[in-house]
Design a protein with these regions (language model features):
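Amphipathic alpha-helical repeat scaffolds
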Residues: 9-13, 114, 139
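Glycine/small-residue-rich loop that forms an oxyanion/phosphate-binding "nest" at active or ligand-binding sites
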Residues: 68-106
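Class I SAM-dependent methyltransferase SAM-binding "motif I" and its flanking Rossmann-like core
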Residues: 94-137
Length: 145
């Protein structure tokens, strides 16, 4: 059955991947990934061979329609990010939206995201919070301005 599955990957330790994520990786026909080199390390660690296709912020707009067509043709596609849950400050929103618009099933596995552990150990109240953006350190060039 054709579908898109968002598969969270470990943040840091490759052994932190869930059994369900491993089974989904084995089950899909194609894996979309931010960086094929980094994803290949995970695949080698898991001893799984699957076709990997680069899908990142620089090419998602130019490749998403072709991927939607592939899913509609009957394949099952997994989307992984370099670390954590796809679409949380990573590529994913566009393909999920297009799958929904095209009546393609989308599944998201539970798994690691840096957001919740950061909140839990912050000492801040965790019953209500807002996540607005991913903070990145300024580049040296930005600091010179």
């Amino acid at each position: 059955m054709s579908k898109l599955i968002l598969i969270p990957t470990p943040i840091g330790n490759l052994d932190d991947i869930t059994l369900r994520a491993i089974e989904c990786i084995k089950d899909v026909d194609l894996i979309l990934c931010e960086d094929t080199r980094r994803s290949l390390k995970l695949m080698n660690h898991l001893v799984i061979k699957k076709p990997l296709k680069s899908f990142h912020k620089f090419n998602e707009h130019s490749t998403v329609e072709k991927i939607i067509f592939e899913i509609q043709s009957g394949i099952k596609v997994g989307l992984i990010s370099d670390a954590g849950t796809p679409s949380i400050s990573d590529p994913g929103y566009l393909i999920v939206k297009m799958c929904i618009d095209n009546n393609i099933d989308v599944e998201c596995l539970p798994g690691p995201t840096a957001l919740i552990p950061a909140l839990v150990i912050s000492g801040l109240p965790s019953d209500r919070f807002t996540f607005c953006l991913l903070y990145t350190s300024p580049s040296p060039r930005d600091l010179r301005k």
